[in-house]
Amino acid sequence: MIKAILIVFLSGCCFAASAQNDSSFLFLKKINGSFTSFEVDNLDNIYLINTTNQLKKINANGDSAGVFNDIKRFGPVTQIDVTNPLKILLYYKNFSTIVVLDRFLNIRNTINLRRQNIFAVNSIATSYDNNIWLYDEQEYKLKKIDDDGTVLLESNDFRQVFDSIPSATQLTDRNNFVYLYDTAKGFYSFDYYGSFKNRLPFLHWANIAVAEKIIYGFSYGKLLSYQLQSLNQKEYSLPAFAKNYMAVKIMNGKLYILKPDGISIYQVK
């Protein structure tokens, strides 16, 4: 079972206070460099794409744990999924191709979605059983494929389910559900057979992650959370030093802030 990719120290008023107090964030370290994007897995490994289009893995001790220099083999990479640290997914939308890397960032295999007549996919996600979810925006179906690209299951045609069809900004497999997020329509949740379960109309979120019974995201300089059981929605202003970021994530109790000169990492007290 894939572990949670996000463990945030967020417990009511405790985090609310910390969101208003910069001293509640302990500076740990900074990784200097010019990076365009990054991801963090559940083992605190950081995956960096620099301005020379190199993907580099830095482990929790700050040591280099892998380098992938062929990141632009299929053009600009659309998405990096590090849900499973042993199986890294690189998705190239322009070529409908998924490159699968091992934990050392060596190529394991390449999946050409076009061979399965899948031509329009905006987002992918590692599934609970180590396969791959995708939303086929041409057939309007949620599909699960294996490492050979074989379709293992698919949902009903969304045109038969929804009056207004969603487009996947992000997919996430967590808590026995698959979450499809459309920035203009909100969250759609499905069971592992592709059956629609629920919709949450939270719009314009970014850097979304789903932890134990909580959905997190960022929007307009704020951290947002939604409790799936209590249905409570909260928002917290980011501290002053987090302003004007290129990207921001809270993973494993740490705040990661990407700016033009590098990534700063803070422990949430």
Roles of regions detected by a PLM:
Residues 59-63, 102-106, 146-149, 191-195, ...:
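Short loop/turn segments that connect beta-strands within beta-propeller blades
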Residues 29-52:
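Beta-strand-rich domains and repeat architectures in extracellular enzymes and scaffolds
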Residues 246-269:
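Blade-level signature of beta-propeller repeat domains, shared across WD40, Kelch, NHL, RCC1
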Residues 33-39, 75-80, 118-125, 163-171, ...:
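Repeated scaffold domains used in trafficking and secretory/extracellular systems
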Residues 1-26:
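Bacterial Sec-dependent N-terminal signal peptides
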Residues 43-44, 85-86, 129-130, 175-176, ...:
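Short coil/turn segments that connect the beta-strands within blades of beta-propeller domains
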Residues 48-51, 88-94, 101, 132-138, ...:
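Conserved beta-strand positions in repeat-built beta-propeller and related beta-rich domains
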Residues 23-31, 63-70, 107-114, 150-163, ...:
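A short beta-strand motif characteristic of beta-propeller blades
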